[in-house]
Amino acid sequence: MKKRVLISFTFVVVIILILVFYIKIHNNKEEDVKINYDNIKHADIENIAQNYWNSDGIYNIAAAEDGYYYVTNEDFLVYFDINTGDTVPVCAKPDCMHDNDECNACLNTCVIYNIYYYNEYIYYMPIINGMANLCRMDKSGSTTKILGELFPSDGSSSIHLAFLGDYAYAYDSGSHLGLDTEFTEKIVEVSLKNGERNEIYDVTGVSLAIKNVKGFGDGLYFNVQHSERSDENISISSYGLYMYSQSEKNVSQISTENINDYYLSDNYLYYFINGQGLYKSDIENQKTELIYKSNKAVDMCNISYDGRYLYISNGKYCDYLRKVLGNKEKKYIVIDTDGKVINEISCADSLEMLFGDDRYLFCMGMGEDQLMYIDKREIEKAEEWKNIFSEPVHLLGR
């Protein structure tokens, strides 16, 4: 009986925490938002980095010219072509059978899941003597080069990368969020030419994380997020949107609003403010409008843009409010740049919502190597997900 009472009490406490969190988010009323346009109004936002992926999740997939790279559940890097159905390990070692950890495609000693494709090279982070390093691999997997050290890592840390010009930028997106110990969070810049390393930004505090780092034009944009938890309350908020200028070598604050995620394109800044919704700011004319309102099932959203439509994901929000919303409410909302809803696509069976490029929309299912996609040529009416792999990709010990 005591055990049953304890379980019931714990359940009630969890529900109260969730509801307080939900109410705190939605007490945020729509209001006039302030954007510092001075530092972004002349920005050339043409960019070749893959900012369309979900920068607040795992990076186990990267787009290439004709297909995609993917890290399997066995930590093997493979290349697949959706049109042909071909899947091959990314290794060109002579006589390699691709069935053990000596294979170049095996990434089991790296920061888990995170791979990137930039300017015709693959980038990942092997761990050497407890330190995550930046490594560059050619497209075939035949040659690799260590460019420089990043951060201490045990493999489970959430070190992410972003790219801009001739530099990679590394940051920890969540290892210390929710902890009671003070840490200094940093963004580290590494030259892709000579490996020179510089710390361009740092912030010290309890339960902080640098999030959603993306490069546009001359600027590297990012959030700083903070969480607080007590017996009665839990809150997650953003300190705003920041930009590091490569040319000026300084950091400025673009907004102090509670921005969860953002995207820049075609002289517009799109950003989602928690408790309010998705805003669109005209950088040239300095005008802002709310184009999509948040609601009880869609908030704290991540966003992406493929040159045609904006994509809104409520996956993180559903994860935080799992007891209230759960996976059944997970979805992508596809809207045009004026806020008109084009489609809503259920992601009830997804573990991770990845976004995608201009060809396909992706998510990770609950099963092993259950990478699923929707062809964006059918995005206006799409409802059902298709599996990339007919079965788990097992290479070890074949």
Residue spans of the language-model regions?
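N-terminal Sec-pathway targeting helices
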Residues: 1-14
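Surface-exposed loop/turn elements that mediate protein-protein interactions on large endomembrane-trafficking
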Residues: 26-54, 76-102, 130-151, 178-203, ...
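N-terminal export/targeting and maturation segments
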Residues: 30-76, 216, 262-265, 270
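Repeated scaffold domains used in trafficking and secretory/extracellular systems
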Residues: 54-64, 99-116, 153-165, 205-217, ...
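Fold-core signature of tandem repeat domains
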Residues: 122, 190, 220, 241, ...
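Loop/turn-rich, solvent-exposed surfaces of beta-rich toroidal or solenoidal domains
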Residues: 298-326, 330
